From Swiss-Prot:
Domain of life: Bacteria
Name of the protein described by the UniProt record: UPF0756 membrane protein BCB4264_A4705
Transmembrane stretches, start-end: 8-28, 54-74, 87-107, 117-137
UniProt-annotated location(s): Cell membrane
Keyword Membrane: yes
């Protein structure tokens, strides 16, 4: 008999494949691999508590690679500071990082939100040619909106 969790993941896998969401399909593939090799009992608790922070660390490493390779240095930083587009990008980077911070907090305290975020992403990708940017920004936006709603209650 197929468990509810396996069926749910399988449905999400099909949706991810239809929507061509590589991150979702790879993530589900890894979860299936862990689940069916019985490593899940050991790894799932760790991923549930530390997975988001681990993912943020990997993303941070990827963002810092151009600095580590010398592709971006002080010269490029100085040149960028002369452009108002760079200042807009800087402000956008700060805003997105702050939104993502709220997203991490929301996903940590309210993990069932992830399902709604995944479905929202799949709908946007499948129906509106959107780009799957991951659950942190979506969760951050949700956190910001929820915080605003709480202020008026």
């Amino acid at each position: 008999m197929i468990s509810q969790s396996t069926l749910f993941l399988f449905i999400l896998l099909i949706i991810g494949l239809i929507a061509k969401n590589q991150s979702l399909t790879v993530a589900i593939g890894v979860l299936f691999l862990l689940k069916f090799t019985f490593l899940g009992d050991k790894v799932f608790p760790y991923l549930q508590t530390k997975g988001i922070n681990l993912g943020v660390t990997v993303i941070t490493i990827a963002v810092l690679v151009p600095i580590a390779t010398g592709e971006i240095g002080f010269k490029q930083l100085g040149e960028a500071a002369k452009s108002y587009y760079a200042w807009i990008a800087l402000a956008s980077g700060v805003a997105v990082a702050l939104l993502a911070k709220g997203g991490v907090q929301l996903l940590t305290t309210d993990p069932h939100i992830t399902t709604a975020l995944v479905f929202g992403t799949v709908i946007a990708v499948a129906l509106f040619n959107g780009v799957a940017v991951g659950p942190l920004i979506g969760a951050g936006i949700a956190y910001a909106v929820m915080s605003i709603i709480q202020m008026f209650k």
